[in-house]
UniProtKB/Swiss-Prot annotation:
A GO MF term: translation release factor activity
Name of the protein in question: Putative peptide chain release factor homolog
NCBIfam families in the record: release_prfH
Cross-referenced Gene3D superfamilies: 3.30.160.20, 3.30.70.1660
Function: Could be involved in translational termination.
């Protein structure tokens, strides 16, 4: 279990994120995706008249971008003030992260080595920002899934507190 969101009552879950892997993981998830109906009076709301409860099960693929550390550096002349030093040395650096295509240009320092170090730090920061954005988008997609549960037309039906399929 990768992530859980606790329910309103003790020992309940509002949401759970489970990871499956192996040869039959896709087929197993396919057999469960959709609406699951549970027919049973609620143990948490005994006087409630409803006995049909619906659960939504969906498949979400993780964004598994393997980020390599391969960075291509290009040196070029800086622009702006600096006199003869700027005009004669290639101290500016354009760094490109090969896996993601993120590119930065750094010319704030006088030395090429210092600019390379800053470029590496900038790329690392941008990669972290990109990963956080992707994670937030996936979390938002899972949150919206809660509101899209189809009540009716269940893929599987279970009855009773023992959760017996039938």
């Amino acid at each position: 279990m990768l992530e859980t969101e606790t329910g309103r009552y003790s020992d309940t879950l509002r949401s759970a994120l489970v990871s499956l892997d192996g040869d039959n993981a896709w087929a197993l998830s396919e057999s469960w995706c959709g609406t699951i109906q549970w027919i049973c009076p609620s143990p948490y709301r005994p006087h409630h008249g409803r006995k049909n409860w619906f659960l939504g099960i969906g498949r979400f693929t993780a964004d598994e971008q393997e980020q390599s550390d391969a960075i291509r550096y290009e040196t070029l002349r800086s622009s702006g003030p600096g006199g003869q030093h700027v005009n004669k040395t290639d101290s500016a650096v354009r760094a490109t992260h090969l896996a993601s295509g993120i590119s930065v240009k750094v010319q704030s320092e006088r030395s090429q080595h210092a600019n390379k170090r800053l470029a590496r730090l900038l790329i690392a920061w941008k990669l972290e920002q990109q990963q956080q954005e992707n994670s937030a988008a996936l979390k938002s997609q899972r949150r919206m899934f809660h509101h899209q549960i189809e009540r009716g037309n269940p893929r599987r039906t279970f009855t009773g507190m023992a959760f017996i399929e039938g």
